[in-house]
Design a protein with these regions (language model features):
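N-terminal Rossmann-like FAD-binding beta1-loop-alpha1 element of flavoenzymes
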Residues: 5-32
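Glycine-rich FAD pyrophosphate-binding loop
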Residues: 24-48
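Dinucleotide-binding Rossmann-like beta1-alpha1 core, especially the glycine-rich loop
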Residues: 51-131
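Rossmann-like flavin
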Residues: 94-190
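Mid-domain catalytic core of redox enzymes
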Residues: 238-356
Length: 487
């Protein structure tokens, strides 16, 4: 293995591995370093006791023509990653104020959401239909310029422009804020919500790589290696070397590696405040980075069931009272959980062959602060009570349970360097002031240093898709920089 490269990518999460693979394909001598034993970051797939599953519950989205499809195509490996599309892929449950739980089937790509089915589930009466259709129509057809005008508007402020029933309000505010971008709806950026909703409407949901998301990132890593990239796993980068305002490489526990370009997938805050060190940046930039707000973390449970209980890959539950705001999160942190919560549950049935015959692995959980010091128990107790109420059969067949919280998420993704951050599900929160035109630049104010992944380099996508989009955009920026900055 060499010790000199054109570019070093710190982190092989969805953004890092995509970026590294593209740069290798375009001829740059590339090293990708990750502290984990496999690629994929928070989206890695594990194999254990005959199961093959993601660390975390996965909402497969969007269904077609996503950034992920585009990246596989550019890398020329679209034939090597089988994207399966279970249809139907899930059930959406809505609980009425009188306590009845209705359900609506969610179809795969090619079967966009039918407003009539949704109206039935949400009890939209004739008197409200016109206004609800106005909301759906405006969101689904909003032009890019108008979307950009929502960069400074929260989801709740946007919804308040419409005189809609509470059920429709909650559908948007719960599912498109906490349920999709993992941020409270009072700060969720409306331009992000609208863009992602449009992708869902046009592309549908439910597209998923056979073998798991991690298998797809392994295929991308394979493409990187086939193009000459080195991939160094189980190696933590301790420091990104900077001298005279330029990066020079990285220091790891396995030695130093040199390159005039370093792309960090380790999160913008850990990169600036720890790996490079604040002494290399202007005070104002350090303050700006320190004040960035993470997405929410997650308190999750994995259950091994003695028999397959859930028929579909994913299930959602919400009610009029599941809209989560910053105030709810703060109250929950002090022990006051809301009475009703949004619940997401997913099963290994997403992809055949992912569980031993006769068994099923089920994920569930609830958003909680990204703070690695928060004990997830309060959230887990609540979510387990809700699972028992809504899906009693699941609880009856639990053979084994595993639990995790934000500290665990941090351990396999980014370090916690700012109080309250580290265990974020997505990365930087897609909130007002941090999205669209306000998204941090992927080019750091140090020569040769870039950020990649959910934190920078793309906006207006959902999680894995966001990180992969960043991988593609940042790879282009790096290539341009490489060509214009001869060594
Ligand atoms: C509970 C949960 C549920 C989720 N559900 C979904 C979902 O349903 N659908 C969806 O699309 N997405 C989902 N996501 C989010 C998705 O996984 C992330 O948005 C995505 O993984 C972000 O990719 P990334 O490239 O930004 O970085 P990450 O995935 O965070 O990867 C960063 C990589 O950098 C490495 N790294 C960091 N620091 C160092 C260092 N110092 N040295 C070496 N390596 C380092 C890490 O080990 C890691 O591999 C979920 C996440 C969680 C936690």
């Amino acid at each position: 293995m060499a010790d000199k490269y054109d570019v070093i990518v710190v982190g092989a999460g969805p953004g890092g591995v995509t970026c590294g693979a593209l740069l290798a394909k375009w001829g740059l001598k590339t090293l990708v370093v990750d502290k984990n034993s496999q690629v994929g970051g928070k989206a890695m797939t594990l194999s254990k006791s005959g199961f093959r599953y993601e660390y975390y519950p996965i909402w497969p989205c969007p269904g077609a023509e996503s950034q992920i499809h585009a990246a596989l195509k550019v890398l020329g490996i679209e034939d090597r990653v089988e994207l399966i599309q279970p249809d139907p892929f899930g059930l959406m449950h809505y609980e009425t104020p009188s306590g009845e739980i209705g359900s609506m089937i969610m179809r795969g790509p090619g079967h966009p959401l039918d407003p009539q089915d949704l109206f039935k589930l949400l009890g939209v009466g004739d008197a409200d239909t016109e206004e609800v259709l106005r909301l759906f129509g405006e969101v689904a057809l909003m032009a890019p310029h108008d979307q950009d005008l929502l960069d400074d508007v929260s989801t709740i402020e946007f919804l308040d422009r419409y005189d809609i029933p509470r059920s429709v309000y909650s559908f948007f505010a719960t599912l498109q804020s906490e349920g999709t971008i993992e941020v409270p709806s009072d700060i969720a950026c409306a331009s992000e919500v609208v863009k992602i909703f449009q992708q869902l409407v046009t592309g549908g949901s439910g597209c998923y790589p056979a073998g798991g998301l991690g298998a797809m990132y392994e295929a991308i890593a394979g493409a990187a290696q086939a193009n000459g990239s080195d991939i160094l796993l189980e190696t933590r980068v301790d420091r990104i070397a900077v001298q005279n305002g330029r990066v020079g490489g990285v220091f790891t526990e396995k030695g130093a590696f040199y390159a005039p370009i370093v792309v960090s997938n380790a999160g913008i805050q850990p990169t600036v405040l720890k790996l490079v060190g604040e002494e290399h940046f202007d005070k104002s930039y350090v303050n700006y980075v320190g004040d960035l707000v993470p997405s929410l973390g997650f308190a999750g449970a994995r259950y091994i069931l003695s028999k397959p209980v859930l028929e579909y890959p994913v299930y959602l539950y919400f009610s009029d009272n599941t809209v989560s705001t910053t105030d709810h999160i703060m109250k929950a942190k002090s022990g006051q959980m809301p009475e009703q919560i949004y619940v997401f549950i997913s099963a290994t049935s997403l992809c055949p062959g992912r569980a031993p015959p006769g068994k099923q692995l089920v994920h569930t959980g609830l958003s909680c602060p990204a703070d690695t010091k928060v004990d997830p128990k309060t959230w887990l107790d609540k979510v387990e009570a809700e699972v028992a109420r809504i899906w009693p059969d699941v609880v009856k067949h639990i053979e084994e349970s595993e639990y995790y919280g934000s500290a665990h998420i941090s351990a396999i993704s980014r370090d916690s360097v700012v109080p309250g951050a580290g265990g974020e599900c997505i990365g930087l929160g897609q909130i007002v002031g941090q999205c669209g035109k306000h998204k941090p630049s992927a080019k750091a104010p140090i020569s040769g240093l870039f950020y990649v992944g959910a934190d920078a380099g793309s906006t207006g996508f959902f999680a894995n898709n966001l990180a992969v989009a960043s991988g593609m955009n940042v790879a282009k920026m790096v290539l341009q920089y490489f060509k214009t900055h001869p060594r």
